């Protein structure tokens, strides 16, 4: 039942940045009529003004939208509820329809400010290319994107270009600077095509985008200092997000055990069944729900089944 489905992991705190995404119910083309896209863009700018959001990038596609948004106040959920609810009311009134136009609340990935946030903005700006709506050389023509606004003489006050430009080689907010930025996007599009989407594919999955240090800090906030960080199932979230949190918790526990056993994780022997590795694996299996697959990969112990065999011999 829908009522029992877990909600996605989401933290709200001052100055947090997010990659927010939602799709039309049954993947229907909500924004294909120009009026629907224009109405959503209007609601988006109204939401930014009402909730004080700083909008780094957005793209309104045929059946979904992407936002790279910074929230000076911890109000993402309230703002998204207003944005989607207001647009849905106007959408249904315009079409004489009823029901939910979106497939659910929304998905929001935490994004580390700076380089990671700029990468998300590039990903968002390149959405029309990946969707084969137009080629990279015509990207500035796509109307329902922050890139289109950045190229205009006047833009909404909520749009902020500093991070996008600074992390693209320190470009200036000028006509020349934006021309260089669109050239840079064309290069990224070509690289992404060669790698079959691998470069940008991770920017819409999981629950956090950023460095390991940033992920660790969010994990601390999420678990509120609880030593039993494995109780993450209670927090809900999609499968990829839960798995990412599990692995972060296992890594944290492994480091603590290694310190207690005086084992240097950076200088483990190559031997798959080295005593140091087996002791670490045994301690992890005794105190966590760690998988053999994770231990085998993290400690270079060969096949997952080998981990249990090595631990049994130790016992």
PLM ranges: what are they?
Residues 1-62, 70-315:
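Short Pro-Cys-Gly-centered "Cys-loop" motif that presents a nucleophilic cysteine in a tight turn
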């Amino acid at each position: 039942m829908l009522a029992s489905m877990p909600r996605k992991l989401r933290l709200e705190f001052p100055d947090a940045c997010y990659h927010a995404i939602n799709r039309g119910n049954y993947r229907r083309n909500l924004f294909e009529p120009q009026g629907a896209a224009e109405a959503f863009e209007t609601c988006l700018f109204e939401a930014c003004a009402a909730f004080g959001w700083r909008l780094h990038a957005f793209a309104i596609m045929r059946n979904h939208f992407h936002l790279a948004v910074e929230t000076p106040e911890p109000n993402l959920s309230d703002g998204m509820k207003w944005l989607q609810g207001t647009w849905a009311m106007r959408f249904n009134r315009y079409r004489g329809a009823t029901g939910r136009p979106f497939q659910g609340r929304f998905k929001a990935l935490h994004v580390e400010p700076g380089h990671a946030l700029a990468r998300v903005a590039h990903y968002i700006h390149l959405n029309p290319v990946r969707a084969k709506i137009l080629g990279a050389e015509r990207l500035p023509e796509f109307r329902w994107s922050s890139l289109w606004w950045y190229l205009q003489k006047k833009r909404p006050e909520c749009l902020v270009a500093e991070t996008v430009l600074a992390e693209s080689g320190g470009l200036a907010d000028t006509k020349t600077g934006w021309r260089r930025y669109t050239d840079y996007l064309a290069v990224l599009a070509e690289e992404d095509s060669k790698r079959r989407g691998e470069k940008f594919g991770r920017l819409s999955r999981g629950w956090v985008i950023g460095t390991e240090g940033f992920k660790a800090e969010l994990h601390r906030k999420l678990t509120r200092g609880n030593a039993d960080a494995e109780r993450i199932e209670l927090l809900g979230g999609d499968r990829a997000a839960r798995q990412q949190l599990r692995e972060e918790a296992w890594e944290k526990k492994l480091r603590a055990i290694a310190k207690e056993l005086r084992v240097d994780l950076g200088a483990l022997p190559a031997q798959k069944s080295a005593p140091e590795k087996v002791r670490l694996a045994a301690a992890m299996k005794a105190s966590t729900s760690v998988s053999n697959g994770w231990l085998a990969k993290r400690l270079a112990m060969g096949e997952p089944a080998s981990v249990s065999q090595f631990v049994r011999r130790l016992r």
